[in-house]
């Protein structure tokens, strides 16, 4: 199994434990993680430094999360810059967040512009052998986050993959397994985000649209059917990354170790 986690988690771990980022990266590797998800905005201008950090820990780039604003502007320069970074860091995938609604926006019109921007991005990426995926973002201002919205976008952008985030559908009160069935054949990347209804290490949590408090949890220990999701992916022949995600965990090292152990042992 190809397990990854986020550079943001390593930075949180570093701050929590008072250790260097290099030490945090090595802890990830020792935990059974082989890939790291980067953020374009945090990495731009520091590519060589990031590559050296990951190389030293025996880690590779799993993907690059990039925020666009296709609903309000054409962004050819950002498209090319993100693709340049992906090639420089040997990243096979860019996870695109295409843009958000602003007050007064016409949702339907913005959604069409987001689809057009994603089609442009996918066309440019295909020329470089890079894949593009988009996740179900957990924000009310993201008109591509609910399962039907995600399906609509996938239909409008044939080359777009689904970065399936297991936790974000719960934010909208949607059933993750129903969402899975709707997008299964387009899943090219997975964010393994488990959620609990109580904190484990003093986490503040996030309030869902159903007014339910949701807290990050080590993968396999929360309220979501993570084992069933992995089983379905495995039976389908999915061979992509499983990205451990629990931002704002009270103890990132503990969460990371438990999550990686659960994933690496699930088929043993």
Residue ranges and their predicted role:
Residues 1-92, 119, 126, 161, ...:
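N-terminal pre-domain/capping segments
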Residues 12-16, 35-49, 68-77, 102-105, ...:
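Acidic-and-aromatic substrate-binding clefts and catalytic sites of carbohydrate-active enzymes
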Residues 21, 47, 75-82, 111-114, ...:
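Aromatic/hydrophobic pocket-lining residues that form the small-molecule binding cavity
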Residues 30, 56, 60, 71-162, ...:
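Active-site acidic/histidine proton-transfer and metal-coordination neighborhood
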Residues 35, 93, 189, 240-241:
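Residues at the N-termini of beta-strands
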Residues 36, 120-223:
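Acidic/histidine-rich catalytic cores of soluble enzymes
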Residues 55, 59-60, 146-158, 220, ...:
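Short, electropositive alpha-helical surface patch
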């Amino acid at each position: 199994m190809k397990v990854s986690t986020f550079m943001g988690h390593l930075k949180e771990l570093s701050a929590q434990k008072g250790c260097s980022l290099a030490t945090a990266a090595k802890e990830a590797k020792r935990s059974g993680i082989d890939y790291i998800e980067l953020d374009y905005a945090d990495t731009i201008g520091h590519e060589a430094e990031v590559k050296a950090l990951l190389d030293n820990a025996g880690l590779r780039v799993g993907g690059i999360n990039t925020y666009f604003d296709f609903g309000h502007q054409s962004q050819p320069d950002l498209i090319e810059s993100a693709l340049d970074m992906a090639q420089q860091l040997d990243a096979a995938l860019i996870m695109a967040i295409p843009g958000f609604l602003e007050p007064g926006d016409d949702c339907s019109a913005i959604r069409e512009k987001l689809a057009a921007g994603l089609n442009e991005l996918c066309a440019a990426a295909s020329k470089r052998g890079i894949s593009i995926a988009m996740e179900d973002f957990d924000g009310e201002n993201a008109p591509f986050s609910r399962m039907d919205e995600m399906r609509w976008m996938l239909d409008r952008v044939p080359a777009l993959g689904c970065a399936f985030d297991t936790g974000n559908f719960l934010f909208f009160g949607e059933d993750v397994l129903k969402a899975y069935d709707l997008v299964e054949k387009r899943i090219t990347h997975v964010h393994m985000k488990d959620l609990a209804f109580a904190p484990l290490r003093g986490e503040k949590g996030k309030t869902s649209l159903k007014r339910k408090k949701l807290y990050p949890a080590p993968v396999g220990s929360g309220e979501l059917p993570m084992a069933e999701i992995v089983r379905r992916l495995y039976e389908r022949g999915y061979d992509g990354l499983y990205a451990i995600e629990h931002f704002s965990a009270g103890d990132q090292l503990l969460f990371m170790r438990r999550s990686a152990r659960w994933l690496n042992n699930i088929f043993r």
